[in-house]
Amino acid sequence: MVFDELITEFDRGLRSIAGVSRMSRPVPKPAAAAPAELSAAERKHAAGLMRVNHVGEVCAQALYQAQKLTTSSAGLKEMFEHAAREEEDHLAWTAHRLKDLDSRPSLLNPLWYAGALAIGVVAGRLGDKMSLGFMAETERQVESHLDGHLSELPAADVESRAIVEQMRADEVKHGKSATDAGGIELPMPARMLMRAASKVMTSTAYYL
């Protein structure tokens, strides 16, 4: 059973890195009728932002995989699995949008994935309450990060905006689930370290 679980997660990890993700929900579409044409500069900026979002979802897959594998609670395994499936939708949506913008995912995805997997293992080894607290804090920071992207996206890019808005709604739900399941608030130094690491990732992934 454990071996089967490892094989499943290994397959998911490879698909996350390779950009071949399964989509259980369709790509969110804007309410507006026809999207406006983006200028070259707007397309480039939107692509940079969506590449950052795609990297965030690669990291989310690794984090949830590690946390799922390190908990002994069947209920938490299911919670992490459910969140990972929704995050896999985000991964597919952002990859789809990058293709529409004639761009590509980050070249450093294997590095981002490996780093996030290691962090997830450490969080999981610290116990379920700490692991859930880490999940809740991660989702809070992602929510803030997506709020920033919603204000930065070109006004005409309603397609990217629709995707980011649905992603944000899902992240809020995941964070609440972690808190409701018993997640504790992380110490301030840990939260600051997470923000610093996130800043390095986002500033790099925008270009690479």
From Swiss-Prot:
GO MF? 3-demethoxyubiquinol 3-hydroxylase activity; metal ion binding
Primary location group:
membrane
Pfam families cross-referenced by the UniProt entry: COQ7
Q: How does it sit in the membrane?
A: Peripheral membrane protein
Is the Iron keyword given for this protein? yes
Q: In which residues is Fe cation 1 bound? A: E57, E87, H90, E171
Write the Enzyme Commission number(s) for this entry. Answer: 1.14.99.60
Q: Which CDD domains match?
A: DMQH
Show the InterPro entries listed in the entry: COQ7_proteobact, Ferritin-like, Ferritin-like_SF, Ubq_synth_Coq7
> Is-annotated flag, keyword Repressor?
no
Q: Which family is this sequence assigned to? A: Belongs to the COQ7 family.
- Protein name as annotated: 3-demethoxyubiquinol 3-hydroxylase
| Species the sequence originates in | Burkholderia pseudomallei (strain K96243)
What lineage is on file? Answer: Bacteria, Pseudomonadati, Pseudomonadota, Betaproteobacteria, Burkholderiales
